[in-house]
Structure formats: structure tokens, C-alpha cells
Amino acid sequence: MQISAGNSTTRRPVDQREIPQGTVSKAVKALMDEGLLEDGEKLLRNPDGRTLSPLRLGSLYATAGVKVTHAQEQPGHVTTALFGLDTTRVLGRTDDAADSWDQVADLVYRQVTALKETEDRVRASHGLPPLRMLGVGVEVGAPVYNGQVMPPSHERSKQPVPLAEKLHRLFEADPNVSRPIPVIVENDVNALAVLAIHEIHYTDPDLVVVGVFDEGVGGGLVMDGRLRRGNNGRAMEIGHLAVAFPPGHDLGQNLDGVEAETARPSATDTVYRARCTCGQLGHVDTLATPGRIVEAFGGGILEQISEIDALDVEFKRARETFKRSGAALGRALAHVSNTVNPNRIIMYLSPSLVAAEHQPDTAGAAYLAAVRAETAGAFAASDEPDYLRIRAFPPDPEAVALLGARAAAVCVLESFIEHALRLDGCRPASRRGS
């Protein structure tokens, strides 16, 4: 088995170890007996000419991934998909509206069980056994800690939502569920970071994954090949970095020194007077998000504003809006680069902002040009051309939801791997009893 050799150049200690051939063979046999691994389709040969038996993740198991979309910090829609273990095969999908966290838990439970029942009927018609569930992953656009959806830090009166616990109880009470089903609840940008780890096959040990959403800018930090969580499990709050004021300026005051109002930003605010949802001024979220770009321009549709060209009388104003917004985001990424010094930064953006980079004569092209210029100026930024790697969100909301569901499903697989490697803090006594 090639697994046994180890890789002395890797940053992850678990990858450096040379594992005895017998141990690898026993582990593979146990995983195949359980159905988590199965034989691949055709034999391979290594450079020495030896025949290798390829393995793949087993088709007996499935993982459910759930994306919960939000509207003003309340759940609005739940998308659940059933995936094969490699998360590239979508076995089924369903969507429903939700207006409370209790309803989210009930919906997820019903959606997962319904999708599994449908797939099991298909398998039975082909003489195959029912699926086994590796787990359920839920991605939410909010801070998450130990399976709880946490309230925003500036709203201390609100209580955490024990979403994982609610789902555990629902699955445990189901007489048709013969095995415990693990439930992993994760922040949306952290889930994208875990997805990135798997998509690059652990080749870059230190990553920052950034998501630029309408609601704000978030970041997931990967160090030594593992997702790192901050205080109370929170992701990186890149959107709350102050970038629009010189050091020493009181962020509770406007530029003229008068104490700022507490109202939320509106289209009538001047650019630098827009207030962040946390109540402060000058944050990245007040400048760099698609919604704020539209507000700063004075209204409209982002795609149409982005496509304004030099023949349009609004071109100069539109270009300056995109340039200012992109520079704010790039300045934040520069701070992240100098603080964390990652191998690379992967950033998810609106497809219209990504497409504009390839249309240099349009106003929207100024956005990524400014992002790249500010990021490249960071002291610790790599000079590699793909140090900042841009990925477009899918163009339609349904595809975005499926991406989130897939990322949530990958979080289940990553949790399984970390548990097997004893990296999750689970004590041996509790492991034996699980």
C-alpha cells in the first residue's frame, strides 16, 4: 500500500509517519468490511512496476448536507442533499422554507429521512441493501460553537440555538434509525474552508478561505492542514476589520468628530458614514459586499452596474465605487496575509464581479484589480501568480445552496477522519464506549 510510505515533506505530523504495512492492511480490511472502502474499477501500477489495487470510498454509505440560508439573522430556507461519501454524487435533493430554528430542525430531520427512504427503494429494486448514514452536516451563516448556532456578538441578549442537540433527539427517537447518526453544524465560510482542504488534497497546509456574501465578509483559517477555530468556535471576522479610517480615529464617531447615529446604513448615507451591523464605522462590510456596492452607487442591479463601460456618463462614478470597494477588501486581505502568512488565499465572489475582471473596459473590472493591488502589496504576500485564487459562486441561488450543502457534507467526512486520527480531543475511554 502506498499509504504506508509516509511523506517527510508534509506539515501534518500524521502524514509524516511511516506506517507498518501490516497495520495499513488491517485498517484497510476493517474499513472494507464496514463498507467505508471498496475496490476500485481497475488495477494500477506504481513506478516500480508493482500492481496496485485502487480503493475508493464505499457506496454503502451516504452523507446528508444541509444549507440553511438566512434573512436578517433568521433562517429563511433549508436545502438538504444526499451525497455519496466522496460528495461528488448527488443522490437526492429537496428544499423548503423555514421561519424558525425549531422548524429548521424538524425540516432537516424530515428531509434527510425522506431522501434516504427514496434512495433505499431504488437500491432495493436493484437488490442492494439500504444506505448507512455516515452523518448529517448543516451549514449556517452564523457563528457556531459545539453544535450551537450562536447569536451575533453585539446581540448578547439572544440565546444560542442547540441545533445539533435538537437533531440528535429527533434521529434518536426514530424507530427506523438503527445506528446513531452524527450531526455536525458548521459556519458557512468554515465549511468552505474544509471543502477547500479536500479539493486541493491537503497540498497547501496553510490557507485562508474568504467568502464575500451580501451579508458580509467571512474567513476560514486552515493551518497545518486543519481548520482552526477562534474564541467560541467563531470563524475569522474579516468583514469587521476597520479599513476606512486612519489609525487612532474613534470608530464610534463620524469623520467630522460628531458621535455617529445608531441607525443601520441606507442608500442615502455617504460612503464612509455607512454603519456596520455591529454598530461601527469603517469596516470592510460597509464597503466591499455586493449589496454595499449597489447602495454606494445609488441603487440598481450589480451585474448591470458592473457592465457600465467608458461610453456611459456614469462610468467614472461606477468605476470609483468598485475601486473603493475592492481596495477596502484587498486591504483587509493584506492584513490577513501579514498576520497569518498563508500559502495562498482562496476567495469566493459573486460571479458578476469575477466575470468583470475579464472585461477590462467595464467599471466592474476595477474591483478585483484593486483587491489584487492591495493584497500584492502586503509584506508577507507570496509573489506566486495564484497566491490569491478567485472562485465564483454559482450563478443561481439553487446551485449556491447545493455548494453549501456539499461543503456541509464534507465537514462530516472531515470530522470522521479527525476522530479516527485522534485529533478531535475525544478521550480513549469515550472512544471505546462510542
What do the PLM-derived regions correspond to, one by one?
Residues G135-E139, P143-V284, G291, A407-R432:
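Phosphate-binding/catalytic loop of phosphoryl-transfer enzymes
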Residues M1-R132, E172-N176, H201, P246, ...:
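ATP-binding/phosphotransfer module of carbohydrate and carboxylate kinases, centering on a glycine-rich
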